[in-house]
Every structure is written in C-alpha cells, then in structure tokens.
Amino acid sequence: IYRGLVGSEMCIRDRYSVRDEAFVADNEIVEKNGKKYNSFGSELSWVEEESYFFRLSKWQDKLLDFYKNNPYFIVPKSRSNEVIKFVESGLKDLSVSRTTFKWGIDVPTDEKHIVYVWLDALTNYISALDYPNKNSDLYQKYWPGIHVVGKDIIRFHAIFWPAFLMAAELDPPKQIVAHGWWTNEGQKISKSLGNVIDPKELIDEYGLDSVRYLSLIHI
C-alpha cells in the first residue's frame, strides 16, 4: 500500500458510483441524456482526491494463474470468463482510502483518510471467524469458505478479495458463486430504488411453491 498525492498520477481521478460504492472504467461508462452511468444503471460522479493505493497490478499474473489452476473458483462459467477477461485487460492499482467521507475506520497512520469500504468490509469474512487467531474453532471450521454473491459485486469478491488475501499470505475462498438479480420492469429490485415486490402478497395470491419456482428460474 502506498500514498498517492493530489495532482500526481497516483491520486484518484475517476468516475464513481455512489450507489455501488465502486469506480468505473472508461469503457464501461454509458452516456444517456447528458449524464454518465455504469452498466447497471447507477449515475456516476467525478472524484478527484488524495488516496492510499493497494498495488493490485502486482497481483494480475498471480490471479490469472490462480483462476487457471482452479477452473471452478468462479461459477457459473459466464461470470468466470467475465472476471478473467477483466483481469487480462490490465489491472490498475486500487484506491483503498478516501478523504471526503465523514465517517468510517481511520487509516491508522493518517487520520485524514478513511479506509475504503470494500477493504474493511471484505475482511469481515475472516475477522468474524476470530482472525488473526487462525487456530480458533471458527476459523478452522469455516475458512476458506464459499461466497454466494450478486453479479454486481463479483469483482470485489473474485479479484480484489483474493488479491488482498494473497498479499497477506492467506488462503482465498474455496469458491465464488455469482447469481443474477430479480428485476421489476427491467430494473434490479432494490430497496434504494423503492421497487421491491412484497413476497407475502405473491405467496397469498399464487402459493409458496409457485413463488419459489418463479424466484429460482429468474436468478
């Protein structure tokens, strides 16, 4: 991890999705009605600030070797191909701190910076298992584990997270299972969008087994 300064090539200068808490590559930006969005329909804002960076580029070849040696690490195959193609296109170093957030975990050596959410959030998978005590019953029983995640956060789990773990000389997860979304009129069902369908109403109308079947075939 190293510090990049404002005005240098190593500060953040990128499009950012607040809803997805993620930066977006130029080739993934969609322009509509004079505004910029990511491929999932989240509006993007421009961010330029000082940041600490994780040297993700260092782990590109190691990640590709890992995927090759573990062909079922990411399922289904379509998601695996998506991740591999993204890594092969070239990984940029990853911003792991922000200076504009009002709350969060302080960077220990620089209280001006807050740890980027996906760095501290991903570590919950092992901190909840008593890490760094790798001899604990919880850690021994559950790690490495299987992650079941939505397709919109697969890069965090299948690229960033394994790279963080490799850098810490820890085992990556056993497998990443990426599922699709339930949609409403073509949009992802989300509480933030207010387009959630009440499953109780569906069950009362069509029965539990029908709702189970409908849910599974569309995920």
Question: Where on the chain are the PLM-derived regions?
Answer:
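Structured secondary-structure scaffolds
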Residues: Y16-V18, K36-I217
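Single conserved hydrophobic/aromatic residue that forms the stacking wall/gate
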Residues: I1-G7, I12, I217-H218
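Cys/His-rich Zn2+-binding cysteine-cluster or related metal-binding knuckle/ribbon modules and their
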Residues: S8-E9, R13-V30
